[in-house]
Amino acid sequence: MDVNPTLLFLKVPAQNAISTTFPYTGDPPYSHGTGTGYTMDTVNRTHQYSEKGRWTTNTETGAPQLNPIDGPLPEDNEPSGYAQTDCVLEAMAFLEESHPGLFENSCLETMEVVQQTRVDKLTQGRQTYDWTLNRNQPAATALANTIEVFRSNGLTANESGRLIDFLKDVMESMDKEEMEITTHFQRKRRVRDNMTKKMVTQRTIGKKKQRLTKKSYLIRALTLNTMTKDAERGKLKRRAIATPGMQIRGFVHFVEALARSICEKLEQSGLPVGGNEKKAKLANVVRKMMTNSQDTELSFTVTGDNTKWNENQNPRIFLAMITYITRNQPEWFRNVLSIAPIMFSNKMARLGKGYMFESKSMKLRTQIPAEMLANIDLKYFNESTRKKIEKIRPLLIEGTASLSPGMMMGMFNMLSTVLGVSILNLGQKRYTKTTYWWDGLQSSDDFALIVNAPNHEGIQAGVDRFYRTCKLVGINMSKKKSYINRTGTFEFTSFFYRYGFVANFSMELPSFGVSGINESADMSIGVTVIKNNMINNDLGPATAQMALQLFIKDYRYTYRCHRGDTQIQTRRSFELKKLWEQTRSKAGLLVSDGGPNLYNIRNLHIPEVCLKWELMDEDYQGRLCNPLNPFVSHKEVESVNNAVVMPAHGPARSMEYDAVATTHSWIPKRNRSILNTSQRGILEDEQMYQKCCTLFEKFFPSSSYRRPVGISSMMEAMVSRARIDARIDFESGRIKKEEFAEILKICSTIEELGRQGK
């Protein structure tokens, strides 16, 4: 079914077609090679924005540090990071004045969070800088490695304790004179294979102990590893993003918890909510400004863009904000929250993999690791790289660059939003004390500013004042990239507002199509995406029906499961035709077994197995959903699964879809090649760790479980919990006496094994 796209636009108002101009179809650009150049750009730019600051040297690490705070007031429109502490504190005070009790209540909520968060919170997240191996690892592994090293160095770390206890260990680790770590290395040797008599490379993994001095350990603890941000659309150049290590993460988590709690209570904040809730919040602010601009007032909106938000922010300003927000709180709480900004003031940026050189004539390739950049002869580099390296050299220590000013991407999204909102808050008439006033929306570095005034001069004056106020706290509104319009038409975080939010449908385009998980999940995700877009994104019935037909077509081509009565020949058609002929009720066959499609836009909410269950032959039902069938996935079946959907813009979203386990919900096995590398042990550790965590959560389903009193290990806690639960179930008649006895027997066996293991 081929569609002429111009037909889609016959009745569409122009503003709704804005979304088709976005660079969202097709594959996004990915980066190749190293991110070293991008990271050096970031470090050099950040220092350039703060160049008039004061230089100092960190006494512990010897790193040169630039502090632009309370630096010169800007004299031109160039971006700069010279925030004035007193201005920031005043903005905070006014924010509190217009929201009585805001900080107090948020602190109380956060204290609760700090008391209850468990260490396993840090296992969430993807790649994390693992300081023990000096490279990136999955979060769970990096945490396990950190805890293991802490233990072997006499710290009390335990992986089922509270996060706050782990953070105490982090603090203690920084006072130690040295830390002993275990590093992995590979030995390669050529040996002759007995069977084939060929020479093969045999790899063995060695572990060796290494001592880190206090200085080296501190550098690693303060290091952010850098990578190139992938899949960014609409940009010519790539840019670097950072991933911090386990020492920093926990502290950042608590600061962001406090800031999130504040943002939730601020009507101008576009975080932490999303989707329709965010749109409603924004529409409220716009409505307020439009109803207040009676016939006498003009109302204009700036679709704002800030220049290099992260690189002009400063951790010292965040420290000042936290000090103010928590000023009436207990000392321990203030200390915990102030550590993250202090660590960021002393952060080091790891320069990534380094540079790859190749000689065309000699067919040689060689890698220059980042550690060598400090003293390698620069004649090998081209001019632009040479300039970068020369500039960054004074900042290098042990292959990392000292980067005191600036924040790396995505670290303090919530707290920086609070700073932005505090400036928007100053637009009330009681603060501007003149005829113009402003309000707006802030979401991390994105903002929309609504200015009301009796005439155009007033609007201009209002925007100017906003611009200059921002400069005082290190926010640089870009005059080139921001534009102003009559209120009613603007864009904010890729939502387009035109007397109400217009669905930016093309943003969702990348999430249509076949995900490639397995036949069962893909069918479910595909129809759920269409259903969700009908609910949230103005996907009309005709277009949805068309999307559905295109999806089914795509699905059949992907899994080669064309209808049993089709003429199309594929590898599977012989088997599928045979099944088609043997089946009495052909409508009952799943699409992935060559059956017909019974979906239409009215029944997208029903999983396909349920939709066709009554129509299936009995023996087909038995094969499809029989738990004894070795092909039915045996992992525990949750009724809802989560898929990661990639919209074209913004973070990957988690989307729920109905999961019915059948022979089609297979899980592909992991690529075997990893099992022959140094990663193998790490992989096994990670799986063990994940299994233990999952098991523990099964026993203690509430997420804020307190530790069972007086119990030392996870295993004992689970056994004691199992006994209690079994007794309750037995006494209430939910399980029989034999089952109860069997559970107690298993518990005793586990305890016995545990004792032998000790």
Swiss-Prot record:
GO terms for molecular function: nucleotide binding; RNA binding; RNA-directed RNA polymerase activity. Phosphorylated by host PRKCA. Pfam families: Flu_PB1. A motif (Nuclear localization signal) lies at residues 187-195, 203-216. One of its GO terms (biological process) is DNA-templated transcription. Residues 286-483 form the RdRp catalytic domain. Residues 55-64 have a biased composition (Polar residues). RNA-dependent RNA polymerase which is responsible for replication and transcription of virus RNA segments. The transcription of viral mRNAs occurs by a unique mechanism called cap-snatching. 5' methylated caps of cellular mRNAs are cleaved after 10-13 nucleotides by PA. In turn, these short capped RNAs are used as primers by PB1 for transcription of viral mRNAs. During virus replication, PB1 initiates RNA synthesis and copy vRNA into complementary RNA (cRNA) which in turn serves as a template for the production of more vRNAs. Belongs to the influenza viruses polymerase PB1 family. Influenza RNA polymerase is composed of three subunits: PB1, PB2 and PA. Interacts (via N-terminus) with PA (via C-terminus). Interacts (via C-terminus) with PB2 (via N-terminus); this interaction is essential for transcription initiation. This is RNA-directed RNA polymerase catalytic subunit.
